[in-house]
Amino acid sequence: MTIFKTVRIAALASVLAGGTISAAGAADVVRHSEPGSHFPISTAIEVPPGATTIYLSGMGAPPVDKAADPKTLAAYGDTETQVRGALTRIQGELAKLKLTMGDVVNMHIYLVADPKLGKIDFPGMMKAYTEFYGTPAQPKLPTRSAFEVAHLANPGWLVEIEVVAVRTH
């Protein structure tokens, strides 16, 4: 009889531990920022156990001038326009997955030098980026890296963005 009591206690402990793990899995994502910094990125992010990670493929902007050759800059606009377009596309893809821009924890932005400027347009990128992040409506900031690259798959693109999002349960 003692052995059956031990098995029941072990089973009960296992069930209770499972409940504890589930509760821990429902924890929030923790975002860390540099103290006193107003730069709209997180310096580190902690993802709770049990969260699902979603990787979105890199996305460029949709054409803004459909009459222009789709392999030219004229079809997609400047850096600011392209970042806004790419982030809007990402927002749409996340929505299909029942996620928001606030669920993004990591972002890589690949930038090609704007031929009109002779360099990447970091201020233009930031202007469009801050329409989506660090706003009162959407204050959750991802970790982010921005890279200058020689070119992208579409010769008309100045920007390609890929993100990682998490879904907490």
Positions of PLM-derived features:
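N-terminal presequence-like segments and the immediate start of the first folded domain
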Residues: F4-T88, G92-V105, D114-H169
